[in-house]
Amino acid sequence: MLFFFNWWILALLLPIEAVTGLYILTVGAGYVCLLMGGLWMSRLLKHNLMDDVFNNENESFMQETRLIESEYSVNLPTRFYYKKRWNNGWINVVNPFRASIVLGTPGSGKSYAVVNNFIKQQIEKGFSMYVYDFKFSDLSTIAYNHLLNHPEGYKVKPKFYVINFDDPRRSHRCNPIHPDFMEDITDAYESAYTIMLNLNKSWVQKQGDFFVESPIILFAAIIWYLKIFQNGKYCTFPHAIEFLNRRYEDIFPILTSYPELENYLSPFMDAWLGGAAEQLMGQIASAKIPLSRMISPQLYWVMSDSEFTLDINNPEEPKILCVGNNPDRQNIYGAALGLYNSRIVKLINKKGMLKSSVIIDELPTIYFKGLDNLIATARSNKVAVCLGFQDFSQLVRDYGDKEAKVVMNTVGNIFSGQVVGETAKTLSERFGKVLQKRQSISINRQDVSTSINTQMDSLIPPSKISGLTQGMFVGSVSDNFNERIEQKIFHCEIVVDAEKVKREEKAYKKIPVITDFTDGDGNDRMKETVQANYRRIKEEVKQIVQEELERIANDENLKHLLQQK
């Protein structure tokens, strides 16, 4: 005001000396005020602390830029921010046998950016493979076509197998309780345990309870009975369900007529002979009710015969096996597929086998018995495990707190897209803290005071993990003695060549028809064939029960079992 708007002083009706003096005074005072204001403004502008409101510079760090490739590695190209510019880098999973977890909310890009690359690169490097495909046939189509296009990584070309309950035409048949792969009754118990806990996931938290163990033991006894009866001719999962659904007055005499099962079933026999009919009915119902949900002609078709074995990493007969679930029927199909999981884990986790990969998409939709043990021991047997799910709370809910913690704490490689809440906090703690610079400015009329200090703070805070955009991932990898990775932690965008992926997908072939149900006249007989198989199994079990009861009745040492009814 004094400097720019004092022209009106010249128009005052005062002596010229007074006007001149007043004008000079206001111009001088205005000039001094202008200088002081400019000085104060320069202090504020010079020390603008709001340029980096999200602390991006402090929380950016140098990441791995080398490509470290080996016969086992999975390598993902990346872009990361550091020192005010974007840099190219690599995520090198040089030891996939220490297991990998891929986390992220729906749409974060975990399958597109990570899981798909694991499948493709491991097929190129000659891995046998087991893929649990929750949204069939997304991952299965990738595995099938990549095997067609890249068979050169294998000494013996693997065969491709698929389990698909929705469409028997495009499914192989496999009996998960094949008698040749059960050595003693503990194998039968593990199969019964797996199927029951998949059908009743709340039982995971109640293991050891009376009404949890009773149905498991009963169903295990039935499986083992079918294994020893006529050398396992009828030892299939559908036959076991049908046998369970016969009258208990017929079941118990038959089972207890075998010395191997007599002690196993003694609690049930005590309840029967002691007149505790209600208790016995409750125990049997605990097994019958959940298993009855699995009575399906299509499921019976797939699980009642074996076109291949589950030793997928057999060096002489390597396999790539994809099993497909359906989100609309995940509870039923997941229980059956859990049985394949448990058998495969036991068969592949052995010395002297081919390197193999187990890829599980949406892990919480299936109960994977022995998962913690597989992660802990598979490294020495060249089994690479890759688990995809949304966050740790799902794992705690479906696997229990103890097993979930073991899985979370023993995995060597972790990828995480956007996650929130406790999962984000857990990951932030895992990535640790780093020394960060802090600057504070104090401005007053006389002086400017600047304070600079350092303190340890989260390298990747939970808020950053909660706000990751699609395709951005944080995580860490493990290394080897001869393949050292100094900077194991990453916070980057995983680069995917979208155009290349589109071209590949456009050229993909559908999984072919495996079983042709067309008759000589060109009519589709799938429904009739599947139904005939369903009726055959029911009739075979009915015949087994009838023959066994006649055997017991004609045996002087056993006929007392029938008289107890």
Language model segments and positions:
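A short glycine-/small-residue-rich loop at the edge of a beta-strand within enzyme catalytic domains
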Residues: 61-69, 335, 362-365, 418
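Ordered hydrophobic segments in well-structured contexts
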Residues: 60, 73-75, 322, 472-476, ...
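Conserved ATP-driven motor cores of ASCE-family P-loop NTPases powering translocation/secretion/packaging/pilus
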Residues: 375-377, 381-384, 388-478
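Low-complexity, polar-biased intrinsically disordered regions enriched in Pro/Ser/Thr/Gly
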Residues: 80-87, 200-210, 438-455
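N-terminal short leaders/motifs
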Residues: 66-86, 265-278, 413, 419-420
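P-loop NTPase motor domains
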Residues: 46-54, 91-384, 399, 465-484, ...
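Basic- and hydrophobic-enriched, low-structure N-terminal and domain-boundary segments
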Residues: 1-108, 112-118, 443-445, 461
